[in-house]
C-alpha cells in the first residue's frame, strides 16, 4: 500500500495535469450548427460565446421564430460538443486518483 507522502505527490501531479487539460480545453473552440448550417454558434471550451453567424437565407423579419429556433439549436449543439469533449478529456482522471 502506498504511504501517505506518495499518495499526496501523486494527487498533486494529477491536479497539475488536470489543470493543464482544463486550460487546453478552455483554449479550444467549438462551433455548433443548426439545420442546413444556417446558424452557427462558436464557444470556447469554458463555455464563453465567441460569436454567432447567421446566413442570409435565415434572416426573415416575417419569421423571427425560425431564426430563434435555429440559434437555440446551434448553441445547444456547441454546448453538447463541449460537454462530450470535457468528459473525454477530464474523465480519464477519475480512475487515476490514488485513493
Swiss-Prot record:
Q: GO terms for CC? A: bacterial nucleoid; cytosol
* Keyword list, A-Z: Cytoplasm, DNA-binding
Compartments annotated for it: namely: Cytoplasm, Nucleoid
| Source species, domain of life | Bacteria
Note the InterPro entries from the entry: YbaB-like_sf, YbaB/EbfC
Molecular function (GO) terms listed? Answer: DNA binding
What parts of the sequence cross the membrane? Answer: none
Role summary: Binds to DNA and alters its conformation. May be involved in regulation of gene expression, nucleoid organization and DNA protection.
Matching entries from PANTHER family are given as: NUCLEOID-ASSOCIATED PROTEIN YBAB (PTHR33449:SF1)
SUBUNIT field: Homodimer.
In which family does this protein belong, per the annotation?
Belongs to the YbaB/EbfC family.
UniProt protein name:
Nucleoid-associated protein SPy_1862/M5005_Spy1580
Amino acid at each position: 500500500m502506498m504511504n501517505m507522502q506518495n499518495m499526496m505527490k501523486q494527487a498533486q501531479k494529477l491536479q497539475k495535469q488536470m489543470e493543464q487539460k482544463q486550460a487546453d480545453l478552455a483554449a479550444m473552440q467549438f462551433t455548433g450548427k443548426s439545420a442546413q448550417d444556417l446558424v452557427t454558434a462558436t464557444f470556447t471550451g469554458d463555455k464563453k460565446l465567441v460569436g454567432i453567424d447567421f446566413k442570409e437565407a435565415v434572416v426573415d423579419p416575417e419569421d423571427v421564430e425560425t431564426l430563434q429556433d435555429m440559434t437555440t439549436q446551434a448553441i445547444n449543439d456547441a454546448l453538447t460538443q463541449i460537454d462530450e469533449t470535457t468528459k473525454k478529456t477530464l474523465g480519464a482522471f477519475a480512475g487515476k486518483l490514488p485513493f
